């Protein structure tokens, strides 16, 4: 019998703290992945913008104008001279949700992933292959072999394929230290606890049918 997992409220955590930011010279994020922005949109933060501009700037005569020395020209911040106007859609998202609204969504997803992490650790026949990273989990089905040989990689590949073929959930694959694992990423805007619970029940149900 597959039981609905008990609910708990683990405290969410985030690696995006000032401690980590100070260790980086540049940070690139994709708002189209976790900030509710339509594809495509990337944001680039640099500690020393002048170093980036010195590296990439070109100024032939035909690009000069009266304001060349007085403005920030973002063509000097990347290899292509031109780009689509991606900033406006991100601006609208930030204006609508605000920083606190976006933080709330991200923290909710991290909290949901923390719940999944707890279920996996308590399951007995699933293994958390790496520590959870924000809302990303790498896990695999690791049942008791009871004297019979099991190809764990092949078993998890079959589990992944059957989960995705069910069309009720979708996972991706990964390899960690050579082992085949299933990659569970929580980041869809409208994901709620009930969706994650249903996904976990589906994982257990299909895994039980394979063992």
Residue ranges of each PLM-predicted region?
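Active-site C-terminal subdomain of aminotransferase-like
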Residues: 22-121
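Conserved PLP-binding catalytic core of the aspartate aminotransferase-like
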Residues: 128-163
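Single conserved hydrophobic/aromatic residue that forms the stacking wall/gate
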Residues: 1-16, 20
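Short, hydrophobic beta-strand segments
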Residues: 92-93, 138-143, 182-186
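PLP-dependent enzyme catalytic core of the Aspartate aminotransferase-like
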Residues: 176-211
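Short beta-strand
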Residues: 127-132, 171-176
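A common structural junction motif
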Residues: 163-170, 204-210
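A generic structural motif
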Residues: 33, 96-99, 143-145, 188-192
């Amino acid at each position: 019998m597959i039981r609905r997992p008990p609910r708990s409220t683990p405290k969410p955590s985030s690696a995006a703290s000032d401690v980590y930011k100070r260790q980086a010279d540049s940070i690139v994020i994709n708002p189209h992945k976790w900030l509710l922005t339509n594809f495509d949109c990337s944001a680039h933060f640099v500690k020393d913008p002048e170093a980036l501009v010195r590296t990439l700037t070109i100024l032939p005569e035909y690009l000069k104008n009266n304001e060349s020395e007085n403005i920030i020209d973002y063509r000097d911040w990347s290899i292509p001279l031109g780009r689509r106007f991606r900033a406006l859609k991100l601006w609208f998202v930030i204006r609508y949700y605000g920083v606190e609204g976006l933080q709330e969504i991200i923290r909710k997803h991290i909290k949901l992933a923390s719940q999944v992490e707890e279920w996996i650790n308590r399951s007995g026949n699933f293994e958390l292959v790496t520590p959870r990273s924000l809302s990303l989990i790498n896990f695999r089905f690791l049942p008791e072999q009871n004297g019979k040989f099991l190809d764990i990689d092949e078993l998890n590949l079959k589990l992944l394929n059957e989960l995705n073929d069910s069309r009720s959930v979708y996972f991706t694959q990964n390899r960690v230290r050579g082992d085949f694992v299933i990659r569970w990423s929580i980041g869809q805007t409208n994901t709620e606890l009930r969706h994650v619970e249903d996904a976990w029940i589906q994982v257990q149900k299909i895994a039980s049918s394979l063992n």
